[in-house]
Amino acid sequence: MIEWFDDLKLGMRFVTPEKRITREDIVRFAREFDPQPFHTDEAAAEHTVLKGLAASGWHTAAFAMPLILATKPFGRHPVFGMGVNELRWLALVRPGDVLHLEGEITELIPSKTRPQGIVWIKWTMFNQRGEAVYSFTPIGIVPRKPGISDQESGIRK
């Protein structure tokens, strides 16, 4: 069971549950946060470079968060972040797409001064056809097991 930074391993993988994104989801988000016609108006979207309604990239990013949280990648600990690297929108997300994410730990860095570690997980979102639509690598902070050394945990610096 994952509970601490010291329980994580390089190459460890996570798979989130699936969730369908609806036309209503796309329009509601876009009206508030990215009010462009190709996100808010199906008829207008047909006459744009997108050739139809598509989710805002920022909606795709926000849509990912509850799916990731459902996997509990850091056990009972909340997901705290220091930043995001390599954020990419790879393909359009359309109404009715069923989305999930797959993640892999790519870096583990124990803190030298605090009882925590830094974790890089590369997440990729896929639609129901297996097409990658979004990827990003958040940099997370996870507590260390109390009183454990790097040598005891097997973490390589």
Regions found by a protein language model. Give the residues of each.
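Hot-dog-fold acyl-thioester-processing enzymes
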Residues: M1-M82, G147-D150, K157
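HotDog/MaoC-like acyl-thioester-processing domains
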Residues: I2-L10, W89-E152, R156-K157
